[in-house]
Amino acid sequence: MTIHRFKAFAATFLAFSLILFASGCGGGSNDDRSPIDFTNGATLSGSIDGAPFKIAVPPADQWNGILLMHVHGYRDRARTENEKDNRVAEAAPGGEATEQALVAQGFAVAGSAFSRNGWAVEEGLVDTVNLTEYFKQRFAPPQATVLLGVSMGSVVALKSIELFPDLYQAVIGLCSVGGGATRNFDLALGVLLAYDIMYGLPENFGFPAGISSNFDFDNDFAAEILQQTQVPEGQVGLEFIRLVSNITSEAFAKDLFSLFFFATEALSELIDRAGGSPIQNLNASYSIPDIARIQLEALGFPAGQIVAGMNQGTVFPANPESRSYLVDNADFSGNHNAPVLLMHTIHDGFVLPANQEAYIDLLSSQGRGAQVFGTYVDSVGHCNFTGSQIGASIAAMGKWLAAGIRPTAADFPEALGFDNNHTPAPFPY
């Protein structure tokens, strides 16, 4: 199934799924749809159409009526015979410890591992619907289903409330890709262009003529990036990439390898799915701060020349069909009425904090600003949250749903590491 048809016939798909579930068909290894007695609570795992899942619920009389549907982040898809995909389903971020804590607080939790790894947004949309309907049949219809989307999972979550407004009531987005996938993958092109001008990318990556659809970061590039961090010539070049990408020093040091993984292997995997390259830089304007350029050139590094070379290289168009694939399943219209709570670390070198502001701006531009609230955590690294911080976001959303009270800064105290006065740097290009 392509996401184009999936989007166009979302309502039809959902109705068809309900028919399948009601008849007991289409459930892979979990064809049993009979109700489960959860008087004393229950934990259930299995697989639906090739997607492993896990569900945990509190005793029936202690359930607060909310189903937290965990939507996991990016998982590497095996590229070599020596690799093995992670197919473990987790019903909450952090696995069993978080699951048990949330169940003890009265939440039902569930999560799918999806039927495929990699940039599995298309699969995530379908598999999350399947698991949500499965939960309703085996246990009980929740009063509210909240999508708890982490990193790439936030794309699934934010897209799902547009496609299935009757199925999901709210979203909590952690380290969200709120600016949409096309914008973020286009940013990767800037990283690649800068590196290629300075050092040359691995030949088997195929940049720029035709990026490989089967590139393995660990085997083909990780050692070279490590070496660059250990020699002066590499260090100054990486600093240039940090500057042109508008990433904080702390975040760049923490997320360096994740950034290059995303720009190479994750992009390669996406190209395999999309049937061509979905990224482009035709309207990009690359730059670094003047003071940084002067400092780098004082060290003998030709920062100005490299910036000029990058701007001469804004000639990469996307494959139109591949671009449409990414737009359709991973960019947002903002057309929904659900409350959305977003939380991001201040220093994130993988998914820029500007993503959070982009989503807030999207809804605000449509007069929906009251539907979204964002907060920041003073920590370094992608999705580097504590359990208490995640718990605060869930508690705030619970209050929002129960009483209609939109969160405020008071729900996210400094004592827990929140910074509600932070304004992130904008997208670099």
Show the residue positions of the predicted features.
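Short, surface-exposed "cap/lid" segments of acyl-processing enzymes
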Residues: 49-52, 58-101
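Short beta-strand/loop motif that positions the catalytic acidic residue
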Residues: 342-344
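N-terminal cap/lid segment of alpha/beta-hydrolase-fold proteins
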Residues: 31-63, 310-312
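Primarily recognizes the serine-hydrolase "nucleophile elbow" in alpha/beta-hydrolase
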Residues: 144-198
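Accessory cap/linker subdomain of secreted extracellular hydrolases
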Residues: 33-36, 177-331
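Gly/Ser-rich "nucleophile elbow"/oxyanion-hole loop immediately N-terminal to the catalytic nucleophile
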Residues: 62-63, 131-151, 167
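Conserved alpha/beta-hydrolase "acid-adjacent" motif
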Residues: 350-355
